[in-house]
Amino acid sequence: MTVLFLCRQNAGRSQMAQAFFERLAPEHVALSGGSAPSDRVHPTVVQAMKEVGIDLTGRTPRRVDRAMLDRADHVISMGCDDPAVCEYPGRKVEDWALEDPSKKAPEEVRRIRDEIRARVEALVSRLRAGQPERAGADRPPRPSRS
């Protein structure tokens, strides 16, 4: 199973989710991307993840592309606001409406980190139970834009 985590800058939420998923579910593949990637992972995010034993210093934000979307079995958006990316026609996108940690104080980044960890833990449990989709949490597929 390949899970794609999306956020706007791929410098905070999606990076944390990918890292937690890689740690908790090494039997699966995690990808992340953003619709408008930053030039680096936010320093407060790097520090918050270091506090839980995950090093993000070598990660670089990247733009989500069609190949990533096509490869993904499950797509999770984190407050992504780019309809061309986050409303992938014909696919369900699970929306985790999470605050952007980019301009938050360290204690707020920790709170967001912990919420992401809890959501990833729940996702991994669903995947292992054979239930990747969370009832009522997914947006319906969007019609193709012609």
What name fits each language-model region?
Residues 38-40, 69, 100-104:
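A short acidic, often aromatic-flanked loop/helix-cap motif at beta-alpha or helix-coil junctions
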Residues 1-2, 68-78, 111, 139, ...:
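Cytosolic catalytic domains that perform sulfur/thiol-centered chemistry
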Residues 59-98:
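Mid-chain, well-packed structural core segment of small domains
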Residues 18, 43-46, 71, 90, ...:
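Surface-exposed beta-strand edges and their flanking turn/coil or helix-capping segments
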Residues 10, 49, 75-76, 116:
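Conserved small-residue
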Residues 1-65:
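Conserved active-site segments centered on acidic
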Residues 83-146:
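Phosphate-binding/catalytic loops
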Residues 28, 32, 56, 71, ...:
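Secondary-structure transition/capping residues
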